[in-house]
């Protein structure tokens, strides 16, 4: 069997990076809630 998780930084950033989050209303809500919670890192990568 092949491994199910094959990490790629570029793919991850494009899907769940800061700019990807800011592109949609729900993504902006995610960033906002993480800011309000006091997260040190708003997005992964």
Swiss-Prot record:
One record GO biological process: translation
Q: Which UniProt keywords apply?
A: Ribonucleoprotein, Ribosomal protein
Query: Which GO CC terms are listed, alphabetically?
Result: ribonucleoprotein complex; ribosome
The UniProt entry, under Pfam families, shows:
Ribosomal_L34
- Name the domain of life: Bacteria
Molecular function terms from GO: structural constituent of ribosome
Concerning InterPro entries, the annotation shows:
Ribosomal_bL34 (IPR000271)
- The reply on keyword Ribosomal protein is yes
Q: Which family does it belong to?
A: Belongs to the bacterial ribosomal protein bL34 family.
| Full protein name | Large ribosomal subunit protein bL34
Question: What organism is listed for this UniProt entry?
Answer: Opitutus terrae (strain DSM 11246 / JCM 15787 / PB90-1)
Query: What does UniProt list as this organism's lineage?
Result: Bacteria, Pseudomonadati, Verrucomicrobiota, Opitutia, Opitutales
């Amino acid at each position: 069997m092949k491994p199910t998780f094959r990490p790629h930084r570029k793919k991850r950033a494009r899907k769940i990076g800061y700019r990807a989050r800011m592109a949609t209303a729900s993504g902006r809500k995610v960033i906002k809630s993480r800011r309000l919670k006091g997260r040190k890192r708003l997005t992964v990568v």
